[in-house]
Amino acid sequence: MKILVLAVVCTVLLQVALSADSEEVRDCIPTRHECTNNQQNCCEGHDCKCDYTEIGGAKKEICYCKKTLWQKTKDKLSTAGDILKS
């Protein structure tokens, strides 16, 4: 009986943890979207890259989420693997 209760508790905790992760993923900033005011919230595998432009004599920072080199490599290898499988 103790094992059954432990299994149920573990299952519930796992579901709570997974739902929290999926909410974080939904709230992240996708590729090529602005992240100027929230530079830490780009989706996994992305970094916030900033450019500086001069508008009316004043410098302005514009940032956007961009895939990291590691993520680009993983995507290319995954695509190549899918092509080889078919």
From Swiss-Prot:
Disulfide bonds: C28-C43, C35-C48, C42-C65, C50-C63
Localization, UniProt: Secreted
Extent of motif Processing quadruplet motif: 23-26
Gene Ontology molecular function, alphabetical: toxin activity
Family label: Belongs to the neurotoxin 19 (CSTX) family.
Function: Insect toxin.
Name the record gives this protein: Latartoxin-1b
Organism listed in the record: Lachesana tarabaevi (Spider)
